[in-house]
């Protein structure tokens, strides 16, 4: 029998009690938040995309508490990750001093996140009315594609709640990989059909050089 991945501590404990069944800790599975960078207004629409602004994308690092996700949502079966390189692979060890400085710089700071996002939203011409962001007379609605097969549903709900708390209206669109892939990876981001997606990836081997991950996640291609 082959079983891969769980974020349920009780399930893990049951597996460990089964005689003759071996298990190992794997660091290959990781989740990330994919953001649509088109904009700041989607072409041929009045729909604002705040994530076209680099400072708003950056501010999400202060808004989201990775440690909460790892300890509470994943039941302690995960660890916070800030970069597209695995923390247990050689590249991270080589960059540990720089990585640690960045991890401290982007530690959770909700008030700073709110301040930066507020400043940038006002620059875009959005206004906060009754605690909700509006743009050209309509609520700023973020379409959030949330995977349902695993802990990403709870991660998505957690992040959606944070965004709603600072004034965004969030349309939570739940679905499986089959449901959502045509939108975020098979469609044109400029169509404005989504703003965020709960991405998930897996590393199947120990890599000595993960430099191409920066190209994959951070450049246009």
Model regions and ranges:
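Extracytoplasmic/periplasmic ligand-capture domains
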Residues: 1-73, 89-221
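Structural signature of outer-membrane beta-barrel domains
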Residues: 78-80
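Outer-membrane beta-barrel and related beta-rich outer-membrane complex signature
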Residues: 83-88
